[in-house]
């Protein structure tokens, strides 16, 4: 009977008097608010990852409703809208909720466990699937309605950090978006595609904190919830013990305002769902350097791929430059080691091989790949090298990933070799070293 009541309640929330679907975007800056849209990152940069927050801390309460949050600076909250599920999908979706999987999702939502609900949907919903059945269309509509209930609100944070509270809203109900995954993106070079992406994971209270990246060219960075990545990466977000400790010195540094937008989908006759995006402003004060764990024993393993797409096992240029950059930033107990099959075997096999060799002598494993995206003459007859990197950080004692990053940078030179070496040098000494110093 309780389960039936929960199912009826969720359906009444989803289908009763909901407005048309929109995109909600947020803009933040140090001096005021605007409602402009935020451009998406370059298509050449994949979704990356990662830092999170220690789950379940006492100060992570989201009892404060976004509608009543007032962080100062003349901020205001404009209530967004929740999309509807078309009537033609009701029967198929009702049949789904009568199944065991549907009942588990209903139970999870009724208890506010949004993380469990999204994980149940992971095995059932694939946004890239071409399968066109009544059930897949109903699930698609249901997921879209869930995503439209996501809201971001400012959170008190120390001067060096930004704080955000993520919630899932339906009318009068507000649930924390438990361990929701968001992508932080910022420009690191003059070229359009020169960006760094870091995935931030909210804690069990839907709260996330992160330091404002010192390497960002702009005083604003972009934070987005990716609708394509519907469910969180279990290897990162499901590990509470792997999440970084939350800073404590409170000081409000951001404010938010959503602006409803939408693009018509001519095929479906309804607005297309875009990512929830916000711009986060740098702290107005002059923050001290974010504290970094520089003394943790660390091994670096990076495999470089050349312009032909083949792995370069005879050189280790990017890893060597990264080691030099970290040593300049006063990291200690850090070194290079063999590749453990990076690029040839799954990541878990790489980690297992490293664990077998090091035992308990090394705490962190930093490993990944680099790839030459472009190496050609530019319009001014100079050579241009576009280099992409993907990096992961594994913590052996915690048995979990703590960070994932992707980055792209561009360098030019008078010769092919010069642009190539410059790109790898900058990627290691500057780009990757800066992001590790900021987020580790």
Curated annotation (Swiss-Prot):
Lipid attachment, kind S-diacylglycerol cysteine: 18
List keywords of the entry alphabetically.
Cell membrane, Lipoprotein, Membrane, Palmitate, Signal
Q: Does the keyword Cell membrane apply?
A: yes
Membrane topology, record value: Lipid-anchor
Which N-terminal stretch is annotated as signal sequence? Answer: 1-17
Q: Where is this region: Disordered?
A: 241-268
Tell me which GO cellular component terms the UniProt record holds.
plasma membrane
UniProt name for this protein: Uncharacterized lipoprotein TP_0693
Where found? Cell membrane
| Lipid positions (N-palmitoyl cysteine) | 18
Where are the bilayer-spanning segments? none
């Amino acid at each position: 009977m309780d389960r039936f009541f929960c199912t009826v309640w969720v359906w009444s929330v989803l289908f009763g008097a909901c407005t048309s679907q929109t995109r909600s975007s947020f803009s933040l800056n140090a001096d005021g608010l605007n409602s402009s849209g935020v451009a998406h990152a370059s298509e050449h940069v994949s979704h990356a990852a990662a830092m999170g927050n220690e789950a379940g801390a006492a100060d992570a309460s989201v009892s404060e409703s976004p509608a009543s949050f007032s962080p100062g600076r003349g901020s205001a909250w404009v209530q967004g809208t929740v999309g509807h599920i078309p009537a033609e999908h009701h029967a198929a979706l009702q049949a789904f909720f009568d199944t065991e999987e549907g009942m588990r999702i209903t139970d999870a939502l009724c208890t506010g466990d949004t993380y469990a609900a999204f994980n149940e949907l992971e095995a059932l919903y694939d946004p890239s699937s071409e399968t066109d059945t009544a059930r897949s269309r109903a699930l698609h509509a249901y997921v879209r309605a869930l995503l439209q209930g996501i809201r971001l609100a400012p959170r008190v944070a120390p001067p060096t950090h930004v704080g955000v509270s993520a919630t899932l809203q339906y009318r009068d109900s507000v649930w924390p978006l438990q361990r929701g995954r968001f992508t932080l993106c910022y420009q690191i070079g003059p070229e359009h595609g020169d960006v760094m992406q870091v995935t931030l994971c909210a804690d069990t209270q839907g709260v996330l904190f992160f330091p404002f990246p010192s390497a960002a060219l702009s005083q604003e960075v972009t934070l987005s919830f990716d609708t394509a990545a519907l469910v969180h990466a279990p290897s990162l977000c499901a590990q509470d013990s792997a999440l970084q400790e939350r800073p404590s010195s409170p000081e409000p540094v951001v404010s938010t305002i959503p602006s409803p937008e939408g693009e018509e989908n001519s095929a479906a006759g309804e607005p297309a769902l875009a990512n929830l995006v916000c711009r986060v402003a740098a702290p107005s004060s002059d923050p001290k350097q974010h504290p970094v764990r520089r003394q943790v024993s660390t091994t670096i393993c990076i495999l470089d791929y050349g312009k032909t797409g083949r792995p370069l096992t005879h050189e280790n240029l990017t890893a060597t430059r990264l080691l030099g950059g970290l040593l300049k930033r006063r990291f200690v107990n850090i070194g290079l080691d063999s590749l453990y099959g990076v690029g040839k075997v799954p990541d878990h096999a790489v980690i297992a091989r490293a664990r077998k060799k090091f035992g308990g002598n090394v705490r962190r494993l930093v490993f990944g790949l680099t790839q030459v995206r472009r190496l050609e003459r530019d319009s001014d007859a100079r050579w241009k090298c576009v280099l992409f990197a993907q990096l992961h950080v594994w913590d052996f004692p915690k048995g979990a990933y703590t960070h994932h990053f992707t980055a792209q940078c561009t360098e030019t030179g008078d010769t092919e070799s010069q642009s190539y070496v410059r790109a790898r040098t900058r990627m290691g000494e500057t780009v990757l070293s800066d992001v590790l110093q900021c987020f580790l």
